[in-house]
C-alpha cells in the first residue's frame, strides 16, 4: 500500500485491517493447492493491488451515493469483485425498453406502499416465509406458528436495527478516518484526494441492501438446490450476503429491481465457483484442523467445505485458477493485467491531482 501511494498507483490508504483475511484466504488456498508459500504470497499480493485500484475506481460513486462517506473508499475484495459484473449487467438492463421506468428504491417503496414498504414489515414477511418453507407440510406449519412468527420478528428487528447501529459506527469511525487522512497527507507531501479504505460494514445498513439481501436469502437456497452441478448449500455463509451490495448500489443508484437481478446473477454463478474451489478449501481446512484440533474447522469425512464469502467471488476464482491451474502463463497474464491497471490508475490519479490543484 505504501509503495503504491509513493508511485501514485493508488489514492487509498487501507486501514481496514479486519478484512485483510480476504487476501490471506486466497493466498492460503493457493498455498495449500500448490504447496508453495511463494505462489500463495503472489496470489495475495495480486488480489490486494487490484482491490486497491477498484477501491479508487468506485470511490467517487460510493461517496456520492452514501451519506457522510466523504474521503472513504472500500478496499474489500469480496465487494470489489462484483463491480465488473454489476457494470455490465446494469448497462444491459438500461438498454431494455421501458426498464428504466422500474425505478424502485427503498425510500420509494416506503412512499408507494406505506407500511408494506417498510424494511421492518419486509423483514417480518421474509422471516415468516423462510420459517414456513422449512416445514414439511401444512400441519407442521400450524404446529410451528410460534417459531415462524418469532423468526419473522427477529428478521424484522434486523431490518430495523442494523441501519441505526450502522449510523453509530459511522459517527465513531469518522474521526479516525479524518485523523488518518491528515496524518498521511503530512507524510506524503503533494498527495491530494487521498481516501481512507474502510470496511463495507459502514453501509450494509442501507435499506436497499437489507431489502435485496433478505429477498435473495431464500432465492439463493433454492438456487443451491435446483442448479445442476452445484454441490454447495450455503448456511452460515448467508450472513455474508449483505457484503455483496455496498459497491453495487452506487452503480444501480439504489434501484431495488436492478440490484436484485445483479445479485441473482452473481450468486447463481458464485455457487459454481464455490463448488469448484471446495476441494482446495477442504484441503486447507483439514490441515488447519490437524494442527489446531479446532472443531469449528473439522469438515466431516465424505463432505467438502466452502464459503459464499469469499469463494463465490469471480475475483478469487480467477486469481486462483490463473495461479494454480496455469502456473507461469496464468501468473504472467495476472502480472500484465495488474501492471496495466496500475498504469491506468496512475494516469487517472495524476490527472485528478492536477485538476484539484488548479
Identify the residue ranges that each predicted region occupies.
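Signature of multi-pass transmembrane helix bundles
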Residues: 1-195, 250-255, 288-358
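Hydrophobic alpha-helical bundle architecture
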Residues: 5-13, 196-280, 284
Amino acid at each position: 500500500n505504501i509503495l503504491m501511494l509513493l508511485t501514485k498507483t493508488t489514492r487509498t490508504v487501507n486501514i481496514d485491517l479486519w478484512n485483510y483475511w480476504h487476501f490471506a484466504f486466497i493466498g492460503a488456498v493457493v498455498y495449500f493447492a500448490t504447496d508453495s508459500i511463494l505462489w500463495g504470497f503472489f496470489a495475495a499480493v495480486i488480489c490486494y493491488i487490484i482491490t486497491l485500484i477498484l477501491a479508487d475506481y468506485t470511490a467517487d460513486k460510493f461517496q456520492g451515493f452514501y451519506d457522510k462517506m466523504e474521503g472513504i473508499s472500500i478496499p474489500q475484495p469480496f465487494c470489489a469483485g462484483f463491480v465488473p459484473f454489476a457494470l455490465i449487467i446494469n448497462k444491459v438492463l438500461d438498454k431494455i425498453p421501458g426498464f428504466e421506468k422500474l425505478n424502485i428504491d427503498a425510500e420509494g417503496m416506503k412512499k408507494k406502499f406505506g407500511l408494506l414498504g417498510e424494511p421492518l414489515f419486509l423483514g417480518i414477511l421474509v422471516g415468516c416465509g423462510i420459517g414456513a418453507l422449512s416445514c414439511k407440510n401444512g400441519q407442521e406449519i400450524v404446529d410451528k406458528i410460534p417459531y415462524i412468527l418469532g423468526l419473522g420478528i427477529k428478521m424484522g428487528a434486523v431490518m430495523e436495527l442494523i441501519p441505526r447501529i450502522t449510523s453509530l459506527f459511522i459517527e465513531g469511525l469518522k474521526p479516525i478516518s479524518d485523523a488518518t487522512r491528515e496524518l498521511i497527507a503530512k507524510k506524503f507531501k503533494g498527495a491530494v484526494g487521498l481516501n481512507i479504505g474502510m470496511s463495507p460494514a459502514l453501509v450494509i445498513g442501507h435499506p436497499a441492501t437489507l431489502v435485496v439481501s433478505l429477498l435473495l436469502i431464500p432465492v439463493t437456497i433454492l438456487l443451491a438446490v435446483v442448479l445442476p452441478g452445484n454441490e454447495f448449500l450455503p448456511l452460515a455463509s448467508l450472513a455474508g450476503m449483505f457484503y455483496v451490495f455496498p459497491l453495487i448500489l452506487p452503480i444501480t443508484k439504489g434501484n431495488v429491481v436492478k440490484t436484485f437481478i445483479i445479485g441473482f446473477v452473481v450468486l447463481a454463478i458464485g455457487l459454481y465457483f464455490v463448488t469448484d474451489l471446495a476441494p482446495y478449501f477442504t484441503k486447507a481446512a483439514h490441515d488447519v484442523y490437524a494442527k489446531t484440533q479446532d472443531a469449528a474447522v473439522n469438515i466431516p469425512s465424505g463432505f467438502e467445505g466452502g464459503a459464499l464469502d469469499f469463494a463465490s467471488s469471480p475475483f478469487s476464482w480467477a486469481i486462483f485458477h490463473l495461479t494454480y491451474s496455469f502456473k507461469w502463463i496464468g501468473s504472467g497474464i495476472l502480472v500484465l493485467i495488474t501492471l496495466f491497471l496500475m498504469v491506468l490508475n496512475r494516469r487517472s490519479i495524476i490527472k485528478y491531482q492536477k485538476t484539484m490543484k488548479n
